[in-house]
Amino acid sequence: MVNTSEENNSNAVMPRKFQGGMNQVGHGGGRIVGQNRRALGGINQNFVHGRPYPCVVHKRVLSEKHEICEKKQADLGHRPITRRFAAKIAGSQQSYAEKTKNSNPLNLNEFGNSIAIDDELKSPEDQPEPMTLEHTEPMHSDPLEMEEVEMEDIEGEMILDIDSCDANNSLAVVEYIEDLHAYYRKIEYLGCVSPTYMDEQLDLNERMRAILVDWLIEVHDKFDLMQETLFLTVNLIDRFLAKQNVVRKKLQLVGLVAMLLACKYEEVSVPVVSDLIHIADRAYTRKDILEMEKLMLNTLQYNMSLPTAYVFMRRFLKAAQADKKLELVAFFLVDLSLVEYEMLKFPPSLVAAAAVYTAQCTVSGFKHWNKTCEWHTNYSEDQLLECSMLMVGFHQKAGAGKLTGVHRKYGSAKFSFTAKCEPACFLLENKNQP
């Protein structure tokens, strides 16, 4: 009986791990490794090729290449040398020698620069020879074009990631803050009213509304309420008056009830009804306040959660990297806008963006609106100019006339005497331009 050698017995091949995959089981119950080693065709590659950068390249003669290939072939698979495997290695070496004789002496590097090999200077002692390098012209030979490309790259990198500092703050909801504000922008128009709704009121006018809001700003400051409460109060007043006719003597009651509802929605500690009666000089009773509260909620269909300018102010101030001074000036300008009836023609997001833009111009003394602010507000400087010029006009006359509640509020030490800052009058220079 003929004894079979272990090298031809598949069961004698011990299972071992090879780079490139897991061991596979053969038909005889043993392990085969043919698909788990590197392909033999990838071993005998032409190693004479250009470097990825300009340098002196040496070439090897055929004898050195055979030594390298044989060494790699011996080390690569780490498998037993069977008769079939040895024959395959010998055949691949022979085919490699034939390809080397017919190979083209011109190779290209990764960047397209040609590298010429001079075969006439080949040394019989198998000494390495340098290869000549042909330089090509650069792609951008014009310095002006290169400068324009560089400036475009710099401008593309000006948008800052304003949420990276809050990555570890779970309350900042960095993961979906952009989606949240996109939703605010989508529904903000639901809280807007017609800028001509006062024409439908029989006993009210724009001046009466301004007096009411100016008084409520002082009440809001005396009660030391949160800033968002004031914005929601004015929003509830306008939305209610746009749907319900109110007589003049009930207008102050509408303002008190709107502030009461805003406090219940925003504040932790809500003013009691008796305090509201007291500040109204007892013009209304407890019953009047409760009845008006029911009427207002039914008229608004209990829809209280609509974005106001305050929601956008916090985000836009963060985009502007505002300090305390810039923040106070921005809120001073937006509070002045609450009093003015004509500002109802602008959506809350635009009012907030214009307040931040005008505040930056006021503090710096020149026009300032960078790419980061434009990206996060979705408003360009040209889109904000109309609203900003109106705010500058409100700032100029803030301390004059009878409605000076906002000026007195921001002229105190509590608000760092912000009302005393000079308005950005240079923005009004564009008023008469087309």
Swiss-Prot record:
Domain of life: Eukaryota
GO terms, biological process: cell division; mitotic cell cycle phase transition
Family matches, as CDD domains: CYCLIN_AtCycB-like_rpt1, CYCLIN_AtCycB-like_rpt2
Keyword Cell cycle: yes
GO MF annotation: an example: cyclin-dependent protein serine/threonine kinase regulator activity
Database matches in InterPro entries: Cyclin, Cyclin-like_dom, Cyclin-like_sf, Cyclin_A/B-like, Cyclin_C-dom, Cyclin_N, Cyclins_cyclin-box
UniProt xrefs under Pfam families: Cyclin_C, Cyclin_N
Keywords, alphabetical: Cell cycle, Cell division, Cyclin, Mitosis
PANTHER family reported in the protein's UniProt record: CYCLINS (PTHR10177)
Similarity annotation: Belongs to the cyclin family. Cyclin AB subfamily.
Role of this protein: Essential for the control of the cell cycle at the G2/M (mitosis) transition.
Assembly and binders: Interacts with the CDC2 protein kinase to form a serine/threonine kinase holoenzyme complex also known as maturation promoting factor (MPF). The cyclin subunit imparts substrate specificity to the complex.
Protein's recorded name: G2/mitotic-specific cyclin-2
